[in-house]
Amino acid sequence: PPRSTLFPYTTLFRSIDREKLAWIMDLKNNRRGRIKEYADHFDGVEFTASKPEPNLNGLWDTNVDIALPCATQNEINGEEAQMLVDNEVIAVAEGANMPCTPEAVECFHANGVLFAPGKASNAGGVATSGLEMSQNSLRMNWTREEVDQKLEGIMINIHKNAFETAEKYGMPGNYVAGANIAGFLKVAEAMQAQGMV
């Protein structure tokens, strides 16, 4: 599959505040602009053009506290995960479908990096679609704030389930195991309730 090395990226050397976040949201949601415009507009931001280096993306060789791979499947491989570890990353949260290879996930776990798998951390889109279907079937019109409040509750519950399930099954802090086991149990319970098992 294609990798995010095909895409440029920005590195923030100063914190992002509400004003800058609003500017980015307007750029992406309304103006449909490119992130380079953000780097051109604000100080403390470095833009790096795409580099066609297969299987190695310099983005991940950056000193960051949190990494959010959100572009595509297999975005971070084991070598790139090690670059993040070497740069003392604290947490990685997937924002796409399996952007981290199994080797990358293993590297994060082996080095004590908090890792949120996409099936949990990237569930907001699916949850919002479910809320939209509920809203439509009820012939209701929720405000953006109401949808956001409902989504927040769903995401808090997903975190709680993954966290508590990992602890219950002897793997505290392993959100991959917690999310997988919690998901399996939910499906198994539904199958039992339907008399399928």
Enumerate the predicted regions with their spans.
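Short, small-residue-biased leader/transition segments that mark boundaries at the very start
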Residues: P1, T5-L12
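Generic beta-strand/beta-sheet core signal
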Residues: R3, P69-A71, E94-G95, A116
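Structured loop/turn residues at beta-strand edges in well-structured enzyme cores
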Residues: L6, T62, N87
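Terminal amphipathic helices with adjacent charged low-complexity linkers/tails
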Residues: T10-D26
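Adenosine-phosphate binding glycine-rich loop
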Residues: M83-V197
